[in-house]
Amino acid sequence: MSESYQKLRKDFKDLDFTDRLTFLAESVLLTGQSAIVGGLEVAGSVVETVAGTVGSLVDASGIGNMLGGSGGVVGETIDRVAITVKDVSRSAGDLYNDAVRNVENVTGNAAKAVGDAGSSASDAVKNIAGSFQKTTGKK
């Protein structure tokens, strides 16, 4: 194993239990974000070879039904990009890349929010644990 991995492992083991949980939660969210963004970039490259305009992009990929109908962040972002684009001659790949950047911003903010929530949760767990130790320590 590499030195950097060994250092990361040691640092992780030195963390409090609640800090470990926070770290793992943030890692899961960021990994999910990377998968979503990577998937959209690949899809954008593939669709660009098939469709050249906003209308044909939506028709060829079924994005309007698949993502737009879900009411999710990705669907809403793609809908907004498609509606607000003035120059229909822009390539489908450019539209996808704009959508990907917007999704990255949203998920990045979500990661920060989870980090903040994790810190609050960590503090709350520490306070409860401290109270529990004080209560059980009295006889």
Swiss-Prot record:
One GO term describing the cellular component: chlorosome
InterPro entries: Chlorosome_envelope_CsmC (IPR020995)
GO biological process: photosynthesis
UniProt-annotated location(s): Chlorosome
Any Pfam family the entry gives: Chlorosome_CsmC
GO molecular function term, any single one: bacteriochlorophyll binding
Keywords associated with the record: Bacteriochlorophyll, Chlorophyll, Chlorosome, Chromophore, Photosynthesis
Main location: other
Name of the molecule in the record: Chlorosome protein C
Species in which this protein is naturally found: Prosthecochloris vibrioformis
